[in-house]
Amino acid sequence: MRHHEGKTFRSNTRLFKRDKALYFPNLNGITLASPKEPQDTSALLRGKVSVVNLFSSVWAESQVATFTGPSQNPGLYEAFQTASPLVQKVDINVEENALKAWLVRMFMFRMRAKLDPAQHPRWFMVRKGLTEGLRESIGMMNSKVGYVYLLDENCRIRWAGSGPAEPEELEALNNGVHKLIQEKKISMESELPAQEWEARTGHDDSASLKPRVVMKP
């Protein structure tokens, strides 16, 4: 089906189930914080709820902004602020053309000035590694279009969007972010040592403690 402005699919209203979700591929590229030493994306993504923007052109970047821009989706930024550091936004600029990649590097200083310093390690430029097989596996069917992925703490793709956002897709993304943040909080609580967990509950009577919920993988 052909969608408006290159949109290749409409997003689910609910999260993909954990046991059915595919993993987001590990990519390697430079960041605004590390322009000379490439970094792995998985090292940054693992352990946090992540909203990942994936794009390879200015047009595609403008499309992902309709999902994750502060003015286009203020509810998402409220979640970033209230649930930090459990949730983060990551930008991945895929630039396989050598000349365009060189131009991006030349103007990285402008992006550093524009972005919050906290976002510098979360802005990647990836030159290679995103093969056709990987693109197909994550639903990136049109390299000219921007894509947004919501990942859980184990780098599993729990939701995805493409092209310009529609109102119901923004709602689905934000609901998914809140749900994964809650899952992450429960996961962290289940991993607390017993003494620390009891201290956080404010009780010293083990019989009155609420049960610890352990999240299954």
For each feature predicted by the language model, list its residue ranges.
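N-terminal "domain-start" segment that seeds a small globular fold
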Residues: 2-41, 64-66
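Intrinsically disordered, serine/threonine/proline
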Residues: 16, 20, 35, 42-43, ...
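Short active-site neighborhood of thiol/selenol oxidoreductases, capturing the structured segment around
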Residues: 39-72, 89
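Short coil/turn segments at secondary-structure boundaries
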Residues: 64-67, 102-105, 137-138, 162-164
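Well-ordered, non-membrane alpha-helical segments in soluble/globular domains
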Residues: 61-77, 104-108, 173
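Eukaryotic short linear interaction motifs
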Residues: 36-38, 60-61, 97-100, 133-135, ...
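Short, internal strand/loop/helix patches
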Residues: 88-92, 100-142
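Thiol-/selenol-based redox modules, centered on thioredoxin-like
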Residues: 132-137, 142-217
